[in-house]
Amino acid sequence: MKLRFAGTILREMLPDRWHMTAFAPTSNDRSIKVDGLKTHDNYQLLNRELAADDPWRLDGNPFERKRHAQMLLLSLAQGPIANALEVGCAAGAFTEKLAPHCQRLTVIDVVPEAIDRTRRRMNKPAHISWVVSDVQQFSSEELFDLIVVAEVLYYLGDIAEMRMAVGNLLRMLAPGGHLVFGSARDANCQRWGHVTGAETVIAILTEMLVEVERLELQGDSDNEDCLLVRFRNPVSSS
């Protein structure tokens, strides 16, 4: 599989200097403001968290485990997955669950240390491609029958950027393909200092996709809040 990024073809096995991870927020510390994804302070915060034994408690927190379990069920609802895209891998907790069900999986993110950690966790399986990119700039020469984008888009600076990111992803979604979206609700995201959250992005996605299934998750704390929605691309392949 070939992926095109910034005019360069990136193949399946990339040199270490190209490894990246996407911004994947968590329910435990999603209040960190990320006004510019590439600022030094934000990278320092992410790198410190990634150095922990269980970054963002994605493995140990019951709410996060439930969120990932429900994301996986939504991802598998359409049947076998030939070619999937995961936008944002954090430390690989969900990647590890999704990968065995995919013939091919592409993982994109913007923080190199996150992809490095996920690759080590996954023992570098041959059917996974790792790409350093953000969601607005990434592009693929192939279409995906599944795209998973969870706890990522509210890090963008404004709704126009969110629309741009959504439009970019939908150009890579195969006819009849599914997109699984997850995010905390608007109110929580705005309380954390972000522009908006789940309801706003869902409305944007609904303009172009068909909503198939929706799940609402709530944990013990106010920060443990998530809407998960599975969408289908209504465009026919014929």
From Swiss-Prot:
**One Pfam family this sequence matches:** NodS
GO BP of this protein: methylation; oligosaccharide biosynthetic process
Report which superkingdom the organism of origin falls in: Bacteria
**Transmembrane segment boundaries:** none
- Is Transferase included in the keywords of this UniProt record? yes
- Protein's UniProt keywords contain Cell wall biogenesis/degradation: no
Coiled-coil ranges (or none): none
Keywords in alphabetical order:
Methyltransferase, Nodulation, Plasmid, Transferase
According to the UniProt entry, its GO molecular function terms are: S-adenosylmethionine-dependent methyltransferase activity
Task: Name the EC number(s).
Answer: 2.1.1.-
Give additional notes from the record.
Necessary for nodulation on Phaseolus vulgaris and on Leucaena leucocephala.
- Similarity comment: Belongs to the NodS family.
Q: What does this protein do?
A: SAM-utilizing methyltransferase involved in nod factor synthesis.
Q: What name has this protein been given in UniProt?
A: Nodulation protein S
Organism from which the protein derives: Rhizobium tropici
